[in-house]
């Protein structure tokens, strides 16, 4: 397996698909990186030369925030919004959808499992 940005990229996949295993790199970014290094997107990772791997690593490290750095930046941005208590921050604090989605009947993933509300007890017959 080729190792790029502390991620094991599968060798039997195409280069473009293999790069998407790195957090922060999607298909379009992977395609741009391949064009920059002048590697065919259809080439398999196992067929890459050492020079091409080094070029891929250097471009990813110099131009893109990936993996831990990107996760850290996203978490800091969310924390900053929570601290200044803006609308988005309040939605994060309350564990509700942030981007304007409806919550009346949906948003179970974000809100968590439904909690039963105790109602009136029915009289025994």
From Swiss-Prot:
GO terms for molecular function: rRNA binding; structural constituent of ribosome; tRNA binding. Keywords: Ribonucleoprotein, Ribosomal protein, RNA-binding, rRNA-binding, tRNA-binding. The keyword Cell division does not apply. The keyword rRNA-binding applies. One of its GO terms (biological process) is translation. Signal peptide: none annotated. Coiled coil: none annotated. This is Small ribosomal subunit protein uS13. Part of the 30S ribosomal subunit. Forms a loose heterodimer with protein S19. Forms two bridges to the 50S subunit in the 70S ribosome. It comes from the Bacteria. Belongs to the universal ribosomal protein uS13 family. Located at the top of the head of the 30S subunit, it contacts several helices of the 16S rRNA. In the 70S ribosome it contacts the 23S rRNA (bridge B1a) and protein L5 of the 50S subunit (bridge B1b), connecting the 2 subunits; these bridges are implicated in subunit movement. Contacts the tRNAs in the A and P-sites. PANTHER family: 30S RIBOSOMAL PROTEIN S13/40S RIBOSOMAL PROTEIN S18, SMALL RIBOSOMAL SUBUNIT PROTEIN US13M. It holds the Pfam family Ribosomal_S13. HAMAP family: Ribosomal_uS13. It comes from Orientia tsutsugamushi (strain Ikeda). GO terms for cellular component: cytosol; small ribosomal subunit.
């Amino acid at each position: 397996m080729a190792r790029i940005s502390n991620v094991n990229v599968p060798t039997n996949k195409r280069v473009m698909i293999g790069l998407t295993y790195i957090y922060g790199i999607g298909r379009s970014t992977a395609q741009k990186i391949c064009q920059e290094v002048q590697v065919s997107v259809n080439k398999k990772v196992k067929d890459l030369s050492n020079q091409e791997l080094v070029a891929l690593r250097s471009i990813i490290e110099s131009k893109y925030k990936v993996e831990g750095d990107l996760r850290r930046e996203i978490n800091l941005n969310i924390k900053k919004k929570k601290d200044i208590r803006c609308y988005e921050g309040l939605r994060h604090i309350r564990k509700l959808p942030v981007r304007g989605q409806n919550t009346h009947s949906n948003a179970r993933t974000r809100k968590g499992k439904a909690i039963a509300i105790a109602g009136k007890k029915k009289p025994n017959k």
